[in-house]
Amino acid sequence: MTKRNLSLLFSSALILLGLGAYLFSAQTAVAQASPLYAQCQGCHQPTGAGVPGVFPPLAGHVPEILEAKGGREFLIQTLLYGLQGQITVKGTKYQGVMPAYAQLKDEEIAGLLNHISTQWGNKFPAGQKAFTAEEVKAQRAKTMTAAQVLEARNKLGLK
């Protein structure tokens, strides 16, 4: 084998290793978020469809939230501090309480938000990237009540 062929073989192997590591890390992040979603699916269902009039859907609604100014922050705040009060999603009213999940690590909350943002046909709006632990940490530095999170949601202009 010539030096050139050996060099090409070595370069190809490095590229494949790098690609494999990237794909593995992406799959690992989704796999780690999926067990966390088990805590959510009792209300929001495995399909993200929720229960009409009782628990709001995540499928089709999370992208609407992400498109609103302040939507990313609101989603993080909802997981950290919970949500209490009446909301309307796609014309259906919901009156209830979503518990806070502040006990989760910043990385877990980011992973869970990335999971619900990319499942059931949901996609990040153009130009938005995946949630990061740093974003969660910034929102964790604030102290909010579930009622204040509701106020933040009301400012998003969602229907």
Region roles according to the model:
Residues A49-I87, Q95-K105:
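Gly/Gly-Pro-rich "capping" loops immediately C-terminal to redox-active cysteine motifs
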Residues M1-A31, T118-Q119, P125, K142-K159:
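Post-cleavage N-terminal segment of exported redox proteins
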Residues G18-Y37, G50, P63-E67:
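Electrostatic cytochrome c docking/interface patches
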Residues V89-K90, Y101-K159:
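Flexible coil segments in periplasmic/lumen-exposed cytochrome c-class electron-transfer proteins
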Residues Y37-P46, L112-H115:
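The canonical Cys-X-X-Cys-His
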